Structures are given as C-alpha cells and as structure tokens.
From Swiss-Prot:
<feature type="binding site">
    <location>
        <position position="262"/>
    </location>
    <ligand>
        <name>[2Fe-2S] cluster</name>
    </ligand>
</feature>
<dbReference type="InterPro" id="IPR006638">
    <property type="entry name" value="Elp3/MiaA/NifB-like_rSAM"/>
</dbReference>
<dbReference type="InterPro" id="IPR007197">
    <property type="entry name" value="rSAM"/>
</dbReference>
<keyword id="KW-0479">Metal-binding</keyword>
<feature type="binding site">
    <location>
        <position position="130"/>
    </location>
    <ligand>
        <name>[2Fe-2S] cluster</name>
    </ligand>
</feature>
<feature type="binding site">
    <location>
        <position position="59"/>
    </location>
    <ligand>
        <name>[4Fe-4S] cluster</name>
    </ligand>
</feature>
<keyword id="KW-0408">Iron</keyword>
<dbReference type="GO" id="GO:0009102">
    <property type="term" value="P:biotin biosynthetic process"/>
</dbReference>
<keyword id="KW-0093">Biotin biosynthesis</keyword>
<feature type="binding site">
    <location>
        <position position="62"/>
    </location>
    <ligand>
        <name>[4Fe-4S] cluster</name>
    </ligand>
</feature>
<keyword id="KW-0808">Transferase</keyword>
<feature type="domain" description="Radical SAM core">
    <location>
        <begin position="40"/>
        <end position="267"/>
    </location>
</feature>
<comment type="pathway">
    <text>Cofactor biosynthesis; biotin biosynthesis; biotin from 7,8-diaminononanoate: step 2/2.</text>
</comment>
<feature type="binding site">
    <location>
        <position position="190"/>
    </location>
    <ligand>
        <name>[2Fe-2S] cluster</name>
    </ligand>
</feature>
<feature type="binding site">
    <location>
        <position position="99"/>
    </location>
    <ligand>
        <name>[2Fe-2S] cluster</name>
    </ligand>
</feature>
<comment type="similarity">
    <text>Belongs to the radical SAM superfamily. Biotin synthase family.</text>
</comment>
<dbReference type="Pfam" id="PF04055">
    <property type="entry name" value="Radical_SAM"/>
</dbReference>
C-alpha cells in the first residue's frame, strides 16, 4: 500500500475517517500500519516521575497540581543514583526507552545539569532516553540535546478550541513554542493528548488535526485515556466509549503513518480485547511498568502475558552512547523488508 506523508490534512478529511464503518476504518488503519511497521512489534517504554507533585499549573486532569487535594505530596528531584537504579530495573524487564518526568511548569536553570546527568547515565546503559519537564526555552532544549537526550515529550493535551476548558495557566501557543525549540535542536518529539475529558468527537478531531499539521509529525504520538483521580476537577467525567477510543488510535495512525502511536495512560482499566483492537488499529508503543508518574498501569506480568497471547514482541533498539557527532543515535532493529513481508 502506497502511503503519502502529509501535513495538509483538513477537518473534513479526518471527520470522514472517523465516520467510516468501524471494520472499514480498522482495515485502512491496519493497512497503513503494515506499510511502515512490523505489526507484531511494539516499542516498550518505562516512565518514572523524577520529581513528583507541587506543580503550580491547574491542568484539570492532573493529580500533581498543588491546588488539588489528591493525596499527592510534593517531593524533591530524585538523585541520579536512584534514577539509574530504576532504569536498570526497567531495562531488565524489557523496556527499550526510559522516560523521566518532572512536575514542573518549566525547569529552573539549576535543574538542567541534574537532569542532564540522569540522561547521560541512563543513555550509557543502552536505553533510549526521553524527558518531560514542562516548557523549555531554546537554551534548555540545546542543553538536553547535548546531554544525549533522544526524545522530548510535550503534549498538546486537547484541541485548541477545548483547551481553555482544561487549562488556564499555560497557553496553547506556549506548547507549540516548546515543540519548536525541541525540533530546532534536533530532538525527536513525543506529542499527543488525552481523550475522555468531556470533549466531543469534533474536539478529538481537532486534536489530531493540530498534531497532523505540525511542521513535522511527532515521532511518538501518545494517546491517553483520562485516568480519573479523586480531587481533580475531571473526576466523575462520563467515560469515553471504548470504540471511540479505538477510532482515535486508527485515525492517528492513518494521519501520521510513520509515527509511533502509543497506547498510553488508562490501560490499567482496559480489557485485553480492547488493547488488542488498539494494536490492530495501529498502536505500536506502550508504557510498561506498574506506574505512570502517579497513576496506575498494568503490571509487567500482565503485559507479558498479553504479548504472548497476541503473538507480539518488544521492539529492540541499539543505542550508540559513544557517538560524539550525533549523541544519542538510535537504531531500531526493525527493517523495511520485515515490514513489507508482513504487509504482503
């Protein structure tokens, strides 16, 4: 199947995809997926909160916002040795990428060298590195790149026209500016959003439209299902129809055919059957481990059993930590010939 990488999607086109009969949408998404990836391989990441709680923002979904009574207390930035120990455990459990998250609006200058040390140590273990630290300026993005960071996560969260219903302390343009800084220094981007926050299908289309018309598609697109935490304003929101969630995955795959589409937060309450539909629809990345920052995630044994039932295997990567001209060069051990073989 010939797939053209596009950045000129319009709302009507994405609406038409969402409106397709469910079997037809999954067929199209699976065909696009097979054109670029081995459908039996799933990239596995582990996420660690290296600085928890005390965030001054007001994101309505977030238990780490200090203004909400969620039982999450503010903690100091972890020591590098603690982070390395967690990364070692993640690698032993099968993760190929280690993501470090901090509950900051944006990092202070004194924090960047500490995070850079974490990145260097984790990279030396042969893991891909990812960080999500809030808003970055150009200099901070460069410092993280120079430390060997591979990916920076900064989500758009939702559609531009629904954003003010969720967040008031940061503008949509602030998020776009951070993504621009990250791209400009050559970091790979991890950028997606959250569904099930009371938005309409039109808002979900708006989120995908914003992502698919960025100057460069995100390398990873996490699709999160809202995890409702008592004490946050969104606790008690009506649950999203599971088939609508699968449609979100499928349209993301079609609109951004070469991106990794990550089945992200919310998996703990998803059935194996729902997750299988998501993999069929084009999801090819997950967070692996019992916790995502402060919320639950399926334990590793459950994921291993699911992979075995579905015949899936973790995508293997090799990281060249000694590459000086291009620190953090990553080679996924997945070949175009393998992808074509499964597409045949």
């Amino acid at each position: 199947m010939s797939v053209v990488l596009r950045h000129d999607w319009d709302r009507k086109e994405l609406q038409a995809l969402f409106d397709l009969p469910f079997p037809e949408l999954l067929h199209r998404a699976a065909s696009v997926h097979r054109a670029h990836f081995d459908p039996a391989q799933v990239q596995v990441s582990t996420l660690l909160s290296v600085k928890t709680g005390g965030c001054p923002e007001d994101c309505a979904y977030c238990p780490q916002a200090q203004r909400y009574d969620t039982g999450v207390s503010a903690q100091k930035l972890m020591e590098t040795e603690e982070v390395v120990a967690k990364a070692r455990q993640a690698k032993a459990a099968g993760a190929s990428r280690f993501c470090m998250g901090a509950a900051w609006r944006s990092p202070k200058e004194r924090d960047i060298p500490k995070v850079a040390a974490m990145i260097r140590e984790v990279k030396a273990m042969g893991l891909e590195t990812c960080a999500t630290l809030g808003m970055l300026d150009a200099g901070q993005a460069r410092a993280l790149k120079d430390a060997g960071l591979d990916y920076y996560n900064h989500n758009l969260d939702t559609a531009p026209d629904y954003y003010d219903s969720i967040i008031h302390t940061r503008q949509y343009q602030d998020r776009l500016n951070t993504l621009e800084h990250v791209r400009d220094v050559g970091l790979k981007t991890c950028c997606g959003g959250i569904v099930g926050m009371g938005e309409t299908r039109e808002h979900r289309i708006g989120l995908l439209l914003a992502l698919a018309t960025l100057p460069a598609h995100p390398d990873s697109v996490p699709i999160n299902q809202l995890v409702q935490v008592p004490g946050t304003p969104l606790h008690g929101t009506q649950q999203l129809d599971p088939f609508e969630f699968v449609r979100m995955i499928a349209v993301a795959r079609i609109a951004m055919p070469k991106s990794m589409v990550r089945l992200s937060a919310g998996r703990e309450t998803m059935s194996d059957e729902l997750q299988a539909l998501c993999f069929l629809a084009g999801a090819n990345s997950i967070f692996y481990g019992e916790k995502l920052l402060t919320t639950g995630n399926p334990d590793t044994e459950r994921d291993q059993a699911l992979f075995q039932r579905l015949g899936l295997r973790p995508m293997q990567v090799t990281v060249d930590a000694a590459e000086h001209d291009h620190p953090g060069t990553v080679h996924a051990e997945i070949t175009r010939s393998a992808a074509c073989e499964h597409a045949a």
